[in-house]
A protein has these predicted regions:
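Intrinsically disordered, low-complexity, compositionally biased regions/tails
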Residues: 22, 37-39, 43, 87, ...
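Short, intrinsically disordered N-terminal pre-domain segments
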Residues: 1-19, 138
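Beta-strand elements of well-folded, non-transmembrane domains
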Residues: 54-56, 68-70, 119-123, 137-139
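Surface-exposed binding patches on compact interaction domains or structured appendages
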Residues: 4-6, 57-112
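C-terminal interaction-tip segments
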Residues: 10-12, 124-139
Length: 139
């Protein structure tokens, strides 16, 4: 996927910023909704590439937080890292599970900032229903 060819419009995200994924079937960026599932593998960690989409040029800082609860913590280790290129599994070794990602650089209007979500299951689970990500931003 060539990021230079992706066009961000007013309809890409509903708010001033949003978390999106690339839909390879329609070949477009889509905002994550309530029915978005993240595939997992019971035998090895999986890394998903998502994108922070900025629509409003007045945003100064964005925080992406993994929302945790006891049930989620008992089933998964989830970590996030920024970056255009896909990190290897070992890149997540020194990152605490359920970490936050704060971004204050590169927040331009109609831009996207890639980040990666690492999911390791603690049992025979094939999907994580409803991505547990919370997005907050400051003007």
């Amino acid at each position: 996927m060539d990021y230079n060819l992706i066009r961000i419009t007013d309809s890409t995200v509903l708010s001033d910023a949003g978390i999106c994924y690339y839909d390879p079937i329609e070949e477009v960026i889509k905002e994550i909704g309530s029915g978005y599932m993240m595939g997992t593998n019971p035998t090895s960690p999986v890394i998903h590439k998502l994108m922070l989409v900025i629509k409003n040029g007045s945003i100064k800082k964005v925080n992406i937080k993994i929302v945790k609860n006891k049930e989620l913590e008992s089933l998964f280790d989830i970590k996030i890292l920024p970056g255009v290129t896909a990190p290897g599994i070992s890149s997540f070794a020194d990152i605490d599970a359920f970490n936050d990602l704060e971004i204050s650089d590169g927040l331009q209007p109609y831009s996207l900032i890639p980040f990666h979500v690492y999911i390791k299951t603690k049992g025979p689970i094939n999907a994580l229903l409803n991505a547990p990500l919370e997005l907050t931003y400051e003007f």
